[in-house]
Design a protein with these regions (language model features):
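Ribosome-associated RNA-binding proteins
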Residues: 1-161
Length: 161
């Protein structure tokens, strides 16, 4: 039996990918590393996926964010930026693609999804997997972080409208 290279390397689950592609909606690709979060809007094309817009958590520096780029609030804000960029490009809906990440309740990938949804993109999701507002606004880290999240969100809103 022939096995695809990316499957052998443990990088792609083709069964999940096919299910996402059948929806014919733009995929909201959320990837996390130890330092950053990345949110991309990808469209399927026969010669390879086309990334319509992309956002990485290090962009938050531009809006005055000086905290970690890999925590739950920064994941939410990165999703919010990506959602606003996608709206500017004419994308109004999408479907979440978390790749090989395990879908755990309250995970950072779902915080990014909440940011995309709050930006105005129509995305199907269950409320039970989204982190609580206290975690999204960083109250579990520091009480003053909630005001910083609101401040950054306001700056993003000013830039993207």
């Amino acid at each position: 039996m022939k096995m695809f290279r990316r499957r052998k390397e443990g990088k792609t689950n083709y069964r999940k990918r096919l299910a996402l592609l059948k929806s014919k909606k733009p995929r909201i690709v959320v990837r996390k590393s130890n330092k950053y979060m990345r949110v991309q809007f990808a469209l399927y094309e026969t010669n390879g996926d086309r990334i319509v817009t992309s956002s990485i958590s290090s962009e938050l520096k531009k809006y005055g964010w000086n905290n970690s780029f890999s925590n739950t609030p920064s994941a939410y804000l990165t999703g919010y930026i990506a959602g606003k960029k996608a709206l500017k490009k004419g994308i109004k809906e999408g479907i979440l693609d978390i790749g090989l990440h395990a879908p755990r309740k309250g995970a950072r990938v779902f915080a990014a999804l909440k940011g995309v949804a709050d930006a105005g993109i129509d995305v199907p999701y269950g409320e039970d997997v989204i982190p609580s507002d206290a975690r999204i606004y960083g109250k579990h880290i520091d009480e003053s972080l909630a005001s910083k999240v609101e401040e950054v969100k306001k700056k993003i809103e000013e830039e993207y409208g």
